[in-house]
Amino acid sequence: LLLIMRERTPITTKLLNACTNLKLIITSGMRNQAIDLKTAKQKNITILGTDTHSNPTAELTWALILGLARNVREETENMYQGYWQTTLGTELKGKTLGVIGLGTQGTQVATIGKAFGMEVIAWSENLKIADAEAKGVLAVAKEDLLARADVVSIHLVLSERTKNLIKYDDLC
């Protein structure tokens, strides 16, 4: 039996014990944090992951940022009602992009922000100043990022450590 799943799908001891013929699990990523690895190893179940692509995440992030900055939804609705460009939107050049989590995806988002002429600042608990500088980004404290950024983009794995890391009041 072969199981192909998203990497966040829980594969528990109960499920592994119920699948008596399971030999291989293939996930859509490499973290495999949702799999009971100990039980899988005991049952000689092989676990493989696929290489993830961060480009689609960065592209979607920028689609959403641009959509908000240029009022795409509102302008599309107005166009269908016969109106043309009722708002100006916001120019991103000269604005500040705050990236929380400067890993692969955060770095790609930061690179695109710089191409738009944005100042890019970043924070994560383990971000080293030299690493940020090597990427052309300024490392700042989380509070400073939240106070200065015109746009905040979060690129952290959701975990108990990161849950509630940023609250509503932090963004207002």
Where are these regions (language model features)?
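An N-terminal-biased, well-structured beta-alpha scaffold segment characteristic
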Residues: 1-48, 147, 167, 172
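Phosphate-binding beta-alpha-beta segment of Rossmann-like dinucleotide-binding domains, i.e.
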Residues: 43, 50-96, 111, 115
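Glycine-rich Rossmann-fold phosphate-binding loop(s) that bind the pyrophosphate
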Residues: 102-103
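N-terminal Rossmann-fold NAD(P) dinucleotide-binding loop
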Residues: 106-107
